[in-house]
């Protein structure tokens, strides 16, 4: 599977708890923090649920 780079660009403050937990589960903390993950269906589903908070690109 391809690797994807996920960057937190908008704050999870004021979002529903499930979205905040998803941000933490992906390993994102502060704004502009990035992680590289495998593009598995589970990770892609998590990214899709918080797509308005993150920027995704190929790593």
UniProtKB/Swiss-Prot annotation:
Assigned keywords, A-Z: Ribonucleoprotein, Ribosomal protein
Top-level taxon of the source organism: Bacteria
GO biological process annotation, one example: translation
Pfam family, one: Ribosomal_L30
Molecular function terms, GO-annotated: structural constituent of ribosome
Xref: PROSITE patterns: RIBOSOMAL_L30
NCBIfam families, sorted: rpmD_bact (TIGR01308)
Name used for this protein in its record: Large ribosomal subunit protein uL30
Organism phylogeny: Bacteria, Bacillati, Bacillota, Bacilli, Lactobacillales
Gene from which the chain derives: rpmD
């Amino acid at each position: 599977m391809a690797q994807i780079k996920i960057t937190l660009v908008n704050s999870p403050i004021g979002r529903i708890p499930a979205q905040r937990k998803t941000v933490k589960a992906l390993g994102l903390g502060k704004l502009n923090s990035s992680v590289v993950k495998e593009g598995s269906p589970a990770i892609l589903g998590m990214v899709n649920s918080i797509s308005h908070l993150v920027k995704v690109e190929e790593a």
